[in-house]
């Protein structure tokens, strides 16, 4: 494969349909949470802190055409959540994946940054009152995706992104183990050459621990 000459790139346009779908999904999650808010809340004691912070490790797994541009990579993601209600949380995330541009000669190192905000709908806690519990959840959100070469003098590109997620949190006393998978749809523009903007897909899988106050 021949070396591509670096040229400045501009922000890729993102198909508005994907972003609209994420907003609609988040709205539906909030509406669903409102209908279950009157249910018995013993699975979610009011003494629980509304704020939750976890740093997770995982992997960014390109799918489809994205596999021709990115190498699967280790990923670190920081998440801050606020429990608006026992069944609904607002979650902000910042992720960093250490990938490579496999479309170029020598596959230069490429930092992939993902940042977003979304809504998370949580089901009743299974085995409530027991030492070991499990809480499944599903969510959706939108934000941005940036690509930046670590050692090449090339401008970073920035794109809109949307995701759907599913996962669960396993609890033992004050320890929580969170496992989550996210399916991302993002805008994409070739980083080192002129070309048409497109839409790409990848999956993030992450796991992390946190300690609760009670």
Where are these regions (language model features)?
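Predominantly the C-terminal beta-signal and adjacent terminal strand-loop region
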Residues: 99, 109-112, 171-214
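A mature extracytoplasmic/lumenal domain signature
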Residues: 57, 94-96, 183
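Outer-membrane beta-barrel proteins
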Residues: 64-67, 101-105, 147-151, 177, ...
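Gram-negative (and chloroplast) outer-membrane scaffold detector with strong preference
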Residues: 39-41, 79-152, 159, 210-214
